Amino acid sequence: MAKVSKRLKALRSSVEANKLYAIDEAIALVKKAATAKFDESVDVSFNLGVDPRKSDQVIRGSVVLPKGTGKITRVAVFTQGANAEAAKEAGADIVGFEDLAAEIKAGNLNFDVVIASPDAMRIVGQLGTILGPRGLMPNPKVGTVTPNVAEAVKNAKAGQVQYRTDKAGIVHATIGRASFAEADLKENFDALLDAIVKAKPAAAKGQYLKKVAVSSTMGLGIRVDTSSVNN
């Protein structure tokens, strides 16, 4: 088990376990506690008042974070013809069709996001057992199956994050890195929150935003007072 630094111990002792912190204070505490030797990711979880067992209450989508994710995203695109050239010009790292499918079947998965034009889905569909478990399968709900592949590439490169409720009705997403300014993390948080609020299912009843927490890869997890966020 990794040793806990004295500083992190002190920070943990300064955080009240049952206290709900204002979002600005929570972000500041998480940043302060991110003392690992790498640039930790800053993550947020939203516990939502939905029933994920019902298909009409599953939330899934994507949003471009205004300050980016702090991560270099490698993008693979399944398309052909003029779209292939447009994807390359937009910054796609890998562009192909049957040849790209063959590369993936051979185990070459050096990318973080897969985008496909609708005409390519007959090929991409055959890769479901490979891409699906890795969360890479293109889906129109998150904008990765689209006739405008160039725009999708630009969004992915600009810091687009995908979100989806898990089996417990919780959305987990990254809003940046510990090296980000507090104001930038807050701006990204607000953009993600806005997207999730707008995605509220009509069938969802009662309180929608039940719990919120902010954390870093190796640091603290801070519970957030939902009244402190603009929802």
UniProtKB/Swiss-Prot annotation:
Coiled coil: none annotated. Gene3D superfamilies: 3.30.190.20, 3.40.50.790. InterPro entries: Ribosom_uL1_bac-type, Ribosomal_uL1, Ribosomal_uL1-like, Ribosomal_uL1/biogenesis, Ribosomal_uL1_3-a/b-sand, Ribosomal_uL1_CS. One of its GO terms (molecular function) is tRNA binding. It holds the Pfam family Ribosomal_L1. SUPFAM superfamilies: Ribosomal protein L1. CDD domains: Ribosomal_L1. Binds directly to 23S rRNA. The L1 stalk is quite mobile in the ribosome, and is involved in E site tRNA release. Protein L1 is also a translational repressor protein, it controls the translation of the L11 operon by binding to its mRNA. Part of the 50S ribosomal subunit. Belongs to the universal ribosomal protein uL1 family. This is Large ribosomal subunit protein uL1. It comes from Neisseria meningitidis serogroup B (strain ATCC BAA-335 / MC58).
